[in-house]
Amino acid sequence: MSKDVVIIRGEALADVAAKLAGEKEIFIVQDENVAHVAAAVAAALGGVKAVIGLKTSEELKTMETAVWVTERLLQADASRGALVLAIGGGITTDIAGFAASMYKRGIRYANIPTTLLAQVDAAIGGKTGVNLHGYKNMLGAFHMPEFTFLTSSVLETLPEKELRCGLAEMLKTFLIGDADAYSRAVSSGFSAKNLDGQDKNGLPSRKNAKIQDELIFRAASIKADIVCRDPLEHGERAVLNLGHTFGHAIEHCSKGEIAHGEAVGMGIILAARLSEGLGLAQKGLAACLEKDFQRVGLETACPYGIDELASAMKKDKKDGRFILLKGIGQPVITTVKEDDLRKYTE
């Protein structure tokens, strides 16, 4: 997989039409919750071959759902030259991308992510896949999208829970790749309640909209750069999993009650504590991150003990590798003994 990671910024959904000019065979795979977004895109394109609607949840992110999408493509006579256009959050882009990777041994796809988490993480980099027996992304493929189209216009009505998830992934990206952007993000007044920040009276402030857009694009660009250097995750790309070893275990233990981004936020704090305990980071890092995360409205306390987490981690595909921190902007990939894991995270 040697394709470049292409990110396009747009002021409005209609801007994507220029990128898709000349495409004769577009199939939209949409999250049914954002059908209005897909309708606007289809109108801007002057029509599409078919729209395939998905009900989205971690429980429905399965091989059966991905195969169902391929069946819809087959019924609509999609050719090898077709383009799947995924419109929705990370679950939608994961399923649509995986279906595209399987159909006729691989057809093209592109993403219009409609959640903050998908814009800064899930829709970028070509990782596609589905869950297996409740374990995250056990089946999948590396299949690079033709492009990912980013516009903050689709985030204006995003629920608070979705904003929390996206903020956690955004801060994760800055923690591994840009200390200055991390500082800017936690000091700009953003929160899970109001992505644009607040003015001195505590009211929503649109003056931060430009900063918001810049930070979203910066986070997406950091991930894109890492993926270009290591598309198949043989080395550096693994740092993007900061907080994910703990996070996936938290998700599994919660049986879906704690969303992915929320779990990653909690996982980053646990990873920081482990980093301190192993002597990789100076004392105080975890407390500093915890304060920052709480400031923007993220939950930081993991509700599960290490016994429950360790059991779930044994099924994790990262095989005992942890992404830890020497400091902000200084990730390190390492293996951790179970004794140390228990000692420093209990």
Question: Which residue stretches match the model-derived regions?
Answer:
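Active-site segments that bind and position negatively charged phosphate/pyrophosphate groups
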Residues: 192-194, 208-307
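Short glycine/serine/threonine-rich phosphate/pyrophosphate-binding segments
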Residues: 91-98, 119, 249
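ATP/NTP phosphate-donor binding region
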Residues: 1-83
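A glycine/threonine-rich phosphate-anchoring loop and its flanking beta-alpha core
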Residues: 98, 102-187
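Generic secondary-structure signature for well-ordered alpha-helical cores
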Residues: 75, 144-148, 153-160, 168-180, ...
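C-terminal charged capping/lid subdomain of soluble metabolic enzymes
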Residues: 168-170, 280-346
